[in-house]
């Protein structure tokens, strides 16, 4: 019987997606997240701030490797990669531990962490293997969390989904920059966008996004391609959404302003508290006006608008 190895990495919550992605890059066949916080308060109107909730600082990212992989080498490589990123994000004291599993344990273990999750008023994320009956008006996003890039329930993703739900009215062109799992593209299609163009620099992300899109019927209007932010893109959009690190977002804003139509929106998430002012200044310098600022814990998300009428924007 083939055996598997379970590598558990304890890290600050801010590092969930980063560590998950690094583990996949280092050969993990699946990842699972243990998090004490899986909650966002209801938002009744656009622009309302999410409530603070009591939470533990650390989460556990569990990665699964076949026994042919030397996990001690993975641990060394992971620690080295994390050390290179300490200037961008405080991951706290990173702790690691390994356990051997039988094949049937692997098949069951990682799935137990994932259940259907109602993320916004309209959107529910459902693991691909789960039978789920939607209620009236509920829109279902099927994802395979074992493919990497998390489950779509991370605070940065949740706030991105809230923002999309509020700005999309139907018929828009959307650019999804750093698509990852493809969850924001799928949501955009469900919320009525006419065409969605999704880009990611990572070939793994491009493949994963395409596979997740194929789990959801009627997604022929989503086009996935490799791309470095918006370099070389000439498609004008009503909405651009990017859930990536703040230090990367600041290199996006000028191209975003060039491509967003008048009265269009730039949604940005993945911004830790200490980087918020930097991102805001970058967007405003490009010509955008801040319409909405959302906060959950250490995370910030925002909606900027390209407009000449500033009466409805913050400070207008």
Curated annotation (Swiss-Prot):
This is Ribosomal protein L11 methyltransferase. GO terms for biological process: methylation. Keywords: Cytoplasm, Methyltransferase, S-adenosyl-L-methionine, Transferase. It comes from the Bacteria. It is an enzyme of class 2 (transferase). Its main location: cytoplasm. The lineage of its organism: Bacteria, Bacillati, Bacillota, Bacilli, Lactobacillales. Belongs to the methyltransferase superfamily. PrmA family. Methylates ribosomal protein L11. It is found in: Cytoplasm. InterPro entries: Ribosomal_L11_MeTrfase_PrmA, Ribosomal_PrmA_MeTrfase, SAM-dependent_MTases_sf. Its EC number is 2.1.1.-. GO terms for molecular function: protein-lysine N-methyltransferase activity. The gene is prmA. It catalyses: L-lysyl-[protein] + 3 S-adenosyl-L-methionine = N(6),N(6),N(6)-trimethyl-L-lysyl-[protein] + 3 S-adenosyl-L-homocysteine + 3 H(+). Signal peptide: none annotated. It comes from Streptococcus pneumoniae (strain 70585). Pfam families: PrmA. The keyword Ribonucleoprotein does not apply. GO terms for cellular component: cytoplasm. S-adenosyl-L-methionine binds at residues 157, 178, 200, 243. The keyword Nucleus does not apply. Coiled coil: none annotated.
């Amino acid at each position: 019987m083939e055996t598997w190895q379970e590598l558990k990495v304890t890290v600050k919550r801010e590092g969930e997606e980063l560590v998950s992605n690094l583990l996949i890059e280092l050969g993990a066949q699946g990842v699972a997240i243990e998090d004490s916080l899986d909650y966002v308060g209801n938002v009744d109107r656009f622009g309302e701030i999410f409530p603070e909730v009591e939470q533990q600082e650390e989460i556990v990212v569990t990665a699964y490797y076949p026994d042919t992989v030397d996990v001690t080498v993975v641990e060394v490589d992971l620690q080295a990669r994390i050390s290179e990123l300490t200037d961008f994000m405080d991951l706290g004291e990173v702790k690691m531990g390994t356990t051997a599993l039988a094949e049937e344990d692997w098949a069951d273990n990682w799935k137990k962490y994932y259940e259907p999750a109602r993320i916004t008023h309209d959107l529910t994320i459902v693991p691909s293997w789960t039978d789920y009956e939607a209620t009236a008006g509920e829109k279902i996003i099927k994802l395979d969390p074992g493919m990497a890039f998390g489950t779509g329930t991370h605070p940065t993703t949740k706030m991105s989904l809230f923002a999309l739900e509020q700005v999309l009215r139907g018929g828009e062109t959307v650019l999804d920059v750093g698509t990852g799992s493809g969850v924001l593209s799928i949501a955009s299609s469900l919320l009525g966008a006419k065409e969605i163009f999704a880009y990611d620099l990572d070939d793994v992300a491009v493949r994963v996004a395409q596979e997740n899109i194929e789990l959801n019927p009627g997604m022929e209007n989503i086009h996935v391609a490799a791309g470095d932010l918006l370099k070389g893109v000439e498609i004008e959009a009503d909405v651009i959404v990017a859930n990536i690190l703040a230090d990367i977002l600041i290199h996006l804003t000028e191209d975003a302003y060039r491509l967003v139509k008048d009265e269009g929106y730039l949604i940005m998430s993945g911004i830790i508290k200490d980087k918020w002012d930097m991102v805001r200044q970058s967007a405003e310098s490009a010509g955008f006006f801040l319409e909405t600022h959302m906060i959950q814990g250490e995370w910030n998300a925002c909606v900027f608008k390209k407009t000449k009428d500033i009466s409805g924007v913050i400070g207008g």
